[in-house]
Amino acid sequence: MATVSLPCTAVLIDLDGTLVDCAPDIVEAANRMLADLGSPALPFGTVAGFIGRGVPNLVRRVLETAQLAPRVDATDAVAMFHRHYADTNGRLGSVFPGVEAGLAALRRQGYRLACVTNKPRALAVPLLALTGLSQYLEVLVAGDSIAQMKPDPEPLRHACNLLDVDAAQGVLVGDSAVDVAAARAAGIPVCLVRYGYAGPGGPAALGADALVDSLEALPALLTPARLAPAA
């Protein structure tokens, strides 16, 4: 995959597992929720494996795994999780190595940068500010910015629209099957980082167009897209 060239104007980047290792924050919040419900904590890897499809899905799977569903109301549990996550958000996790250098290089080369995440805006905004990553990003499309979330392609199209870039000139950078599915549905290339929350089999098994060990390696894979001449 080292010889892959991905033409693009906009680089759309996932948050959890791609820019920031949020798993410690999320797992701690989930286990605090379970403690409130009188249930033992789940293993770190179990909860981390539920990351990527939004908070309601994560909470539902945590409740099922802890054998608390359906007697615990999922809506109440989501509110409980959010309360704890507001406290842990950005406190235990960290920016992955190479992320800031990679984003800075992409900006210098003129690429338009957006973060497209399934994390709610109320959590994504403070996390990006706390980590200092918001300075590199022009646009944030969060899990509640529009009606759809990844793997639906609409968040990717919405990000490109906000950047005033043709959606066909985007490339998605992520870490999971959710990102691959969203990019395929949007008809754009997808590059996965080798770290993150890909799950069993790792990112190599997910059929991405490219893999990188770090965002520092991403600029070498990209080539500026050329607009077709006007008719």
Swiss-Prot record:
Biological processes annotated in GO: DNA repair; glycolate biosynthetic process; reductive pentose-phosphate cycle
Catalysed reactions, semicolon-separated: 2-phosphoglycolate + H2O = glycolate + phosphate
Pathway info: Organic acid metabolism; glycolate biosynthesis; glycolate from 2-phosphoglycolate: step 1/1
Active site: D14
Entry keyword annotation includes Transit peptide: no
Sites where the protein binds Mg(2+): D14, D16, D175
Keywords from the UniProt entry: Calvin cycle, Carbohydrate metabolism, Hydrolase, Magnesium, Metal-binding, Plasmid
EC number, UniProt record: 3.1.3.18
Any one annotated GO CC term: cytosol
UniProt cofactor(s): Mg(2+)
GO MF terms held by the record: metal ion binding; phosphoglycolate phosphatase activity
Free-text function comment from the UniProt entry: Specifically catalyzes the dephosphorylation of 2-phosphoglycolate. Is involved in the dissimilation of the intracellular 2-phosphoglycolate formed during the DNA repair of 3'-phosphoglycolate ends, a major class of DNA lesions induced by oxidative stress.
Family that this chain belongs to: Belongs to the HAD-like hydrolase superfamily. CbbY/CbbZ/Gph/YieH family.
Entry-linked HAMAP family: GPH_hydrolase_bact
Subunit structure and binding partners: Homotrimer.
Protein name listed in UniProt: Phosphoglycolate phosphatase, plasmid
Native source organism of the sequence: Cupriavidus necator (strain ATCC 17699 / DSM 428 / KCTC 22496 / NCIMB 10442 / H16 / Stanier 337)
